[in-house]
Amino acid sequence: MNQLFGSDKLRLPQRAQAGIAFVRYLIARMNHDRINVNAGYLAYITLLSIVPMLTVLLSILSKFSVFENVGSVLQSFIINNFVPASGDAVHAALQEFIANTGKMTAVGAAFLFVAALMLISNIDKNLNYIWRVKKKRRAVFSFSMYWMVLTLGPILVGASIAATSYITSLRLLDSEAISTVYDQLLRWLPFILSSSAFVGLYLLVPNKKVQFSHAVVGAMIAAVLFELSKKGFAAYITQFPSYQLIYGALAAIPILFVWVYLCWLIVLIGAEVTAALGEREHWRPAEDVIQSLPNNDTELEKDTQRDRFDSES
């Protein structure tokens, strides 16, 4: 560790050295995994699957009378808290798309369900690649897990929203002190929900054991980046409305794509942090970082060995 910078003269505390080695390894790991390319791919799949996902979710909620009106509340909450700027235009477009799906045949409805499964499957594959998972889940187990997400997920979301609405209607909130606490809780609710979702994602999706503390650290970093990017992206859209000037009424489409891309980039950064924290043995000096990456790509290994041979000869 004392030779982290290639010199014994420059000595840093052990924790600082470990931190610098971790950051270098993390950057090399993210470059190696090309998370910017994968984020673009996931953004593309998400835009193809977002309407099917919402359609499946809302159709399941509509089967339960207790969840009446929960769908509209859920859409408004997602748009207002997780889509910065142009939220009204995106909301209106999504509502129009979802309304049109009611005219579809059974074959079209089956296609929507397959598209929703495709998104979940691609998320699973990309995150398992980050953790270098070589052993794939059985097809039956994977399908049952995806099915559970699509069926139980909407029910749990609807139950939480219904419970929140019930608590809001109680007279206990008439108290000024409790009302202040409730307002603060609502202000922090998007951050709490996003960080909790990241923790669950980093713990449950990889087909290997992930330490809870590592998942929490990665989730907190991702949640902070998400909140900062939300404010920064909203400020950029409002202060520099180039998309509105160029695309006019269609500006919501590229804006939504860029935002979804940023979201997936943040998700993958948090996953890389979580995975790298569990690979302490690979935190080495910068010149050894690439060779230390646990890789499941045989072609890349061959290219690396060929480069070493050429340099030695």
UniProtKB/Swiss-Prot annotation:
Listed Basic and acidic residues bias regions: 299-313
A Pfam entry, by short name: Virul_fac_BrkB
The UniProt record lists the keyword RNA-binding: no
InterPro entries reported in the protein's UniProt record: UPF0761_bac, Virul_fac_BrkB
Domain of life: Bacteria
HAMAP family listed in its UniProt record: UPF0761
Protein name: UPF0761 membrane protein VV1_0885
Protein source organism: Vibrio vulnificus (strain CMCP6)
